[in-house]
């Protein structure tokens, strides 16, 4: 997909009052202002009016350090250097990732960030239970963005939008002021993302964000960049890029360097590139990517795609598409409710 100035061209989606089965959405949240750092890139989050860092701190990896103090230091250093977008999930490391981020956001750091987490619950009951746990772990009364996690099965959209589906809990939580924006994530197949957008539209609902794989191999197989991103941009939905390195597997292919992979992601019309950061050196790499970023030319993009095509087609490096390696809810169906 060619790079475009999506801040100017993304059209805000409107919900028609006459849509069959339309869900009565709460008023739009008021954007908040956060400190910015001249060495960081900032972008608009879809059509929300929120301005967030183009580099997002991945939540999974900050729950892996042996010493929780190391996790907190990574988070504080990231924020001090201008990263405002915090990623997390209710199930990451059995809740440890949220707990550590909650401690890190004490003492004024919460006001400096745009906080996102994800919930697995597909029913009202399970969603509400997980939301209350996440609020407690994160030491906050309101989470800026909550996303339906791992929408990876074709039936997931219908479960979420069912009469007892989690969408109703999310909307009630937004109305109550517990969450500000609603999105969804998935990594398996673009067809599932498109189905989610189709079901949402049928119910008169507009997502604020959608999270998807965006990396140097995606273009060659089940491409979210080609199939989903244009639809999201057209609907004014903020695109959150993930799986930039495919965990470590894409880098293991030896076809691309880390900075090159991050610059490729930042060149796409995304609001945020969420990247896993498990140490201060890896954080430094992400900060360097922001400082040195210049949009890749068409020739540079072509060179990257030519280099990665053969490896991508083996299916060995985007394991989140081809194996259950990353499917936490498949291994733990009780999380869905």
Indicate where each model-derived feature is located.
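Structured C-terminal cap/extension of enzyme domains
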Residues: 13, 203, 227-337
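A general structural detector for well-ordered alpha-helical segments in enzyme core domains, enriched
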Residues: 41, 71-75, 97-104, 130-134, ...
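Short catalytic-loop micro-motif centered on adjacent basic/acidic residues
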Residues: 84-91, 116-118, 180-185, 211-212, ...
